Amino acid sequence: MSLIVKQSFSNILIILFAFTLGALNTLFFYPSIIGTEFYGIILILLAQSNIIQPIFSFGLQHSVIKFFSSVESKKEKDKILILSLISPLFVIVPISVIFILNYNFIGNYLSTENPLIKKYIYIIISIAISTAYFEIFYSWCKVQKKTVFGNFLKEFYQRCLITILLFLYFFKLIDFKYFTYFLIFGYYLRLIFIAFYSLSIYSPNFKISVPKNLKEILYYSLLIFLSGFGASVIIDVDAAMLGKLVQDEIVAYYKIAIFITAIIDSPSRALFQILNPMVAETINKKNIPKLEQLYKKSSSNLLLVSGFISVLICSNIDDIYEIIYTLNSDNGFRIAIPVVFYISISKLSSALVGCVNSIISNSKYYYTVPFFSISSAITVIFLNIYLIDKIGFIGAAVSTMIVIILFNFLKLSFVMYKFKIQPFSKDTLYILALIFSNFLIFYNLNISDQFLINFVLKCVFIFFTYSSVTYFMNLSKELNSFLKIKWKEK
């Protein structure tokens, strides 16, 4: 069975379990156990840590994936890996020193709205360092095509850690201060796990020396770092701008809608863990026919699986919001239902273009990545300003959808022009028809007046309808092969 199918299937399961646990943490455990004030503190500090983390890693985890397969000798490969460990220290050490020397000033600045934040800002630097090195060691695993354990640590472990700490807090075994201490400890324990695992797969010779292509590696890292900034703007700018333009509760409704649609990305996140290094290796070997094959397969399989998830979500959206109302007793969340539809369309557009981002970022045209990223960030900001004013907070979702579809089309066109390859086949039309027809059939179908029963039964019917058509029309040869092998094993 294909290595991609094996690991992608395992990674999808991990991400789905992680998403379920994350949903419980976000919608129920956090608010009811730790309270909204402390919950807000954790969210703010972890968000700030996530902003700093890319500065610390400086895109070197992506450089490992791009350049590791481009060199033949173990000596040169080892130089790249050691560089990825040492280089972040030139950023981490001075920033950490500045942070410590100006601790009170930074604390006062960050705690203007909530004075309690000042007491816990050590979380920002501590977790940023841990996460930066986790990503670097995880990239070591990816280039060896071993992604499942790292994906488990990245997606499921941290959510499980939060759940355990919340219950320790609930049973009064720890207070909030020790909650933060154990949170940091848990992140560093995760780093130790991935470090030992990556070294068990591939152990470099720990001798400090400079790779032959040092300039190219650092230049690539810089460009990826800049593009990461643009990507983070697209992710966070909606909520940030809405916070200035609409009421706080509207922002909360918007964030929950975004959270619901996040699961549509799970197949992409799972697939690209293993696909990125394979695309890099294929490009380094100049194997364009294989690259086109990866391109087409990633497009059709991602569209098929992401389409299935989007049909489940969009067809059951009323029941999903009924569940949210039961947990929170706030019916206002329903006004964000259109956000779910717009963001779902944008995510399906990203699934449709498959591994186009991997192709561009791992090719000699990687210098265009910051252009696409920063241009899309600027465009979404201007569209937000215009559309939020015209149609309210829904305008933020519309602008996101427009920008993602537009720039996916531009990237698709760029790859077609430069590589003479495209990701579509006749199966693409069949899959799109399958997604649209299933949505039309099940969206207005009500089987029971009890929303939980209705939700479960519709999910079952959608699963059997969608999977049966997929199997008998052979829309995914990889998925059919996987099912046949599993059937034979039984």
Which positions does each model-derived feature cover?
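Helix-loop junctions and terminal segments of transmembrane helices
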Residues: F56-E72, V143, A257, T261-S299, ...
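Transmembrane helical elements of multi-pass membrane transporters/channels
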Residues: Q7-A23, F182-S198, P211-E281, N301-L302, ...
